[in-house]
C-alpha cells in the first residue's frame, strides 16, 4: 500500500497490511454496530447541547471489502442508527451514490420514510454492471433516478416548512 491508509501517511508492505487487517478479524457487523451505537450515545447528547446536527455518511462502497463489515449501507441500517439514539440530531448524509450502488436500495423510499433526519445531501450518480461493479456516472445517466430523488427531497423540505421546523435547509453538494 504505497499511499497509506485513511488517517495515515506511511506506506505498508503486503505483510504489514495483512497484519494490520488481522487486528479486525473478530469484528463483525454486530460488533461494529454496537461500537457505532455506543459512540452515538455519547456524542449525540453533546451535539444536542451545542445545536449540532450530526449526519452519518453511508458506507462507500456499501458492501464488505477486505473482509471488513459495513453497517451503513441499507435503509434498515439507517433505521437501526435512528432507533439506537432517538434524537433529531442523529441524522443522515443522504448520498445517492453510496446508497445507489445497491440495486435493493429504494432511494426515493428512503427519503420518503426517513427524510425527517436527512441533514445533508450528497448527489452522486453511479452505474452498476451485471457483476456488481460500479463507477461514477453523469447525474442524469446513472442508475439513480435523480428526478425522483430530488422531488422527494423537495417534498421533505415542504413538510418541514409546513410544520414550522427550523432546519428547513438541507445543504448539498453534487
Q: Which residues fall in each region the model found?
A:
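Active-site-proximal, glycine-rich beta->alpha crossover segments in alpha/beta enzymes
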Residues: 1-37
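Histidine-acidic metal/acid-base catalytic patches
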Residues: 14-24, 37-49, 53, 63-174
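Residue-level "edge-of-site" marker
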Residues: 60
Amino acid at each position: 500500500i504505497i499511499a497509506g491508509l485513511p488517517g495515515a501517511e506511511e506506506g505498508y508492505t503486503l505483510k504489514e497490511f495483512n497484519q494490520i487487517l488481522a487486528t479486525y478479524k473478530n469484528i463483525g457487523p454486530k460488533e461494529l454496530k454496537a461500537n457505532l451505537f455506543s459512540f452515538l450515545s455519547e456524542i449525540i447528547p453533546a451535539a444536542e447541547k451545542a445545536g449540532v446536527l450530526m449526519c452519518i455518511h453511508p458506507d462507500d462502497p456499501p458492501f464488505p471489502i477486505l473482509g471488513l463489515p459495513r453497517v451503513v449501507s441499507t435503509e434498515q441500517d439507517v433505521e437501526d442508527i435512528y432507533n439506537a439514539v432517538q434524537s433529531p440530531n442523529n441524522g443522515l448524509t443522504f448520498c445517492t451514490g453510496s446508497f445507489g450502488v445497491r440495486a435493493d436500495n429504494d432511494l426515493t423510499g428512503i427519503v420518503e420514510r426517513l427524510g425527517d433526519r436527512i441533514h445533508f445531501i450528497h448527489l452522486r450518480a453511479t452505474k452498476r454492471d451485471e457483476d456488481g461493479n460500479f463507477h461514477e456516472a453523469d447525474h442524469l445517466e446513472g442508475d439513480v433516478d435523480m428526478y425522483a430523488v430530488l422531488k422527494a427531497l423537495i417534498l421533505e423540505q415542504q413538510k418541514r416548512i409546513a410544520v414550522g421546523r427550523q432546519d428547513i435547509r438541507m445543504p448539498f453538494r453534487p
